[in-house]
């Protein structure tokens, strides 16, 4: 693995070389709130995992720490200095967030990325009022990745770097969407997404959990069960009879072929159960951030192989180089793609 230290050192150099007043910016975040960054942003607190991942891809030097610190296997694909940063408490709306602990870290900005709802908007406003720290909530949906990067780039004074990531994301999405849209409806597979070791927890229609699957036009068999996530029954899954099963659980992936309860389902009979890669972050649903962009390529090649001849190994290497600031070896890419670590 080659480490792109320019991503870290370049950010540090920019912070020193650019006059501080050039960093100040005011944006309208995804909730419609006006957020003004301070004159100099050097420490950013991520409210949750999507914010941490997105901030890492753009400005790793500014990341104070991780709500869910990467483990040993994940750290292999991240900048060592940043991956080793400490655990931070998640900011929630349940009243159990230690705001004094957050302010003691002296962040210049609190960043949240994800679903934009009235509850999250209220949380952002309340935390900003109580701490005096600017709090930006940006949209985490795939079709908003470019806009989110550009807004974040403005806040951080990293406009050029943000534009590179935004353009790459938008061009990738446009290409995948264009080719997916050309697939006739009758050739769009029925897909079931299994999230746990029982295979019964799934992503429901319109949720961020199942967003990548639905985004490229596959038919999520659980789409009529609206919400975030839920539990299906075996009888429901048998009735849906998915042609493809995508799973993020390695135990389920390893056991389903030998499980008689699943034997009659089309995807199992055809050997079309696919374990999603998860290093350093999940490729399909968690955390729901830009890490799912490479997952779109992976899913598209599974769903529509004739329309997507691109080499997934090359795509993986290039994505990790640009977004994670490391260039994995061929052996590392192979290990990522097996999804079994």
Language model region names:
Residues 223, 229-251:
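Ligand-binding pocket segment of bilobal, Venus flytrap-like solute-binding proteins
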């Amino acid at each position: 693995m080659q480490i792109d230290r320019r991503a870290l050192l370049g950010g540090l150099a920019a912070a020193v070389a650019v006059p501080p007043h050039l960093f100040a910016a005011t944006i309208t975040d995804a909730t419609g709130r006006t957020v003004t960054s301070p004159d100099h942003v050097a420490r950013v607190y991520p409210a949750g995992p999507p914010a941490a991942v997105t901030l890492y891809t753009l400005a790793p030097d500014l990341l104070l720490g991780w709500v869910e610190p990467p483990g040993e296997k994940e750290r292999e694909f991240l900048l060592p200095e940043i991956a080793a940063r400490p655990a931070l408490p998640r900011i929630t709306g349940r009243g159990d967030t230690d705001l004094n602990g957050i302010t003691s870290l002296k962040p210049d900005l609190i960043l949240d990325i994800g679903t934009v709802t009235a509850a999250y908007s209220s949380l952002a406003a309340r935390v900003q009022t109580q701490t005096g720290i600017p709090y930006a909530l940006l949209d985490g949906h795939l079709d908003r990745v470019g806009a989110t990067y550009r807004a974040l780039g403005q806040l951080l004074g990293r406009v050029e770097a943000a534009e590179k990531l935004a353009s790459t994301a938008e061009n990738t999405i446009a290409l995948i969407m264009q080719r997916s849209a050309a697939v006739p409806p009758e050739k769009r597979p029925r897909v079931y997404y299994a999230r746990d070791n029982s295979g019964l927890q799934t992503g429901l229609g319109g949720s961020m959990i199942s967003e990548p699957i639905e985004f490229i036009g596959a038919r999520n068999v659980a789409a009529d069960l609206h919400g975030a996530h839920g539990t299906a029954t075996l009888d429901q899954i048998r009735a849906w009879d998915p042609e493809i099963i995508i799973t993020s659980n390695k135990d389920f992936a390893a056991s389903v072929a030998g499980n008689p309860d699943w034997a009659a389902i089309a995807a199992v009979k055809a050997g079309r159960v696919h374990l999603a890669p998860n290093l350093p972050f999940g490729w399909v649903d968690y955390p729901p951030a830009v890490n799912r962009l490479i997952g779109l390529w992976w899913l598209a090649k599974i769903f529509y192989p004739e329309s997507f001849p691109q080499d997934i190994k090359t795509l993986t290497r290039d994505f990790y180089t640009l977004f994670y600031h490391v260039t994995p070896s061929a052996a590392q890419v192979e290990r990522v793609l097996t999804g079994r670590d």
